[in-house]
Amino acid sequence: MKNYFDSPFKGELLSEQVKNPNIKVGRYSYYSGYYHGHSFDECARYLHPDRDDVDKLIIGSFCSIGSGASFIMAGNQGHRHDWASSFPFFYMQEEPAFSSALDAFQRAGDTAIGNDVWIGSEAMIMPGIKIGDGAVIGSRSLVTKDVVPYAIIGGSPAKQIKKRFSDEEISLLMEMEWWNWPLDKIKTAMPLLCSSNIFGLHKYWREFVV
């Protein structure tokens, strides 16, 4: 099978890859999938492209997604762990013995990834998870709980390792929402965006963006 990507050193914008209408993407978010060979659509597991009554995968702007990251969709996929059996009898109606089975399917809600989120290679995001702006998800993490903004998490199941900045700095970043700025403002602020000077960036925002 031909590799969708030409190089491991270059990602492709999601806006130029995604064909599934149930995946919503923001500007400049990209997937770097060279080591797995497929486009981003295949990262969204069990997400039906031809139905509009399913949970959506929503990805914000300026997100970086590593090769082989996966987003498990389709709710509980017909498995009820609180029933005597988790087996999806309902989906095997061709077997007469299963004809009275109830539909065990439950939606999990949309999976929502914030803005400026970095998701490492082969991380797995479970159904209905919400990941806050600025979060960092370590490679091969299994994300089973919502992630607060600007947290760094890792492990299986994933746990918070630390926050990227102080609570005050995070509050300023959330107030500024730099990912929504027009490109000319981002261009001028680039030296600050490429630094740890959050207070300086906030000062720029107050003077030139608001």
UniProtKB/Swiss-Prot annotation:
Disulfide connectivity for this sequence is none
**Which keywords are on file for this protein?**
Acyltransferase, Antibiotic resistance, Repeat, Transferase, Transposable element
Q: Which InterPro entries match?
A: Hexapep, Hexapep_transf_CS, Trans_hexapeptide_repeat, Trimer_LpxA-like_sf
- EC numbers listed for it are 2.3.1.28
Q: Which CDD domains match?
A: LbH_XAT
GO BP term, pick one: response to antibiotic
Q: Which GO terms describe its molecular function?
A: chloramphenicol O-acetyltransferase activity
Q: Does the keyword Transferase apply?
A: yes
- Give the catalysed reaction(s), semicolon-separated: chloramphenicol + acetyl-CoA = chloramphenicol 3-acetate + CoA
Q: Which PROSITE patterns match?
A: HEXAPEP_TRANSFERASES
- So where's the catalytic machinery, residue-wise? 79
Q: Which domain of life is it from?
A: Bacteria
Does Transport appear among the keywords? no
**NCBIfam families documented for this protein:** chloram_CatB (NF000490)
PANTHER family given in the database record: ACETYLTRANSFERASE, CHLORAMPHENICOL ACETYLTRANSFERASE
What is the documented function of this protein? This enzyme is an effector of chloramphenicol resistance in bacteria.
Concerning its family, UniProt says: Belongs to the transferase hexapeptide repeat family.
- State the protein's name: Chloramphenicol acetyltransferase
